[in-house]
Amino acid sequence: MPKIVDHDTHRADLALRAASYFSEHGYGGVSMRKVATHLGVSKSALYHYFPTKEALFLACTKEVMKSVVVPQASGASQKAQIQALTKAMAPDFGSEMALLFDYLRGKTAEEIAQDEAMQVSMAAHHAAVAEIVGEDAAQETLEHMMGQLLIGYFRGINGET
């Protein structure tokens, strides 16, 4: 009897596992052949699910962004909730920014603004912040958080508040 494969689940699993490989090696250091080897699948199997490296990166972004959730702190103030979210983002911030800048290298501002992976990432982070502070304050709060994380990373404190 043939093996029944849930293609959507398998595709999501491949993307999630490939995301860590992108983080470790950077966008420029990844090839479809290397990812296929890392995942233990043939290159043709990988291409069956993802026709290009950019399509794979987009799928990885979508899967990783599903895990962006607001830490639950019932009764906590908005400030405490934003601090908890910032702290939750801190451990992977440096590697995520390095990967992101590698991915964006050579793209124009217009290309970046139209890039689906960037839109997915920004929307997920914006939604998480808006859940805490509301839509009106979300963009400014997110910008403050990203600045805080960046300065914290440069200071070697992982953006902790």
Regions found by a protein language model. Name each.
Residues 1-3, 82:
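Short, Lys/Arg-enriched N-terminal segment that forms or immediately precedes the first helix
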Residues 98-105, 134-161:
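Hydrophobic alpha-helical segments that form the core
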Residues 59, 69-95, 141:
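Hydrophobic alpha-helical connector segments
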Residues 15, 58, 83, 122-130, ...:
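An amphipathic alpha-helix signature
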Residues 90-119:
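Amphipathic alpha-helical segments used for helix-helix packing
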Residues 2, 10-13, 17-55, 59:
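Helix-turn-helix
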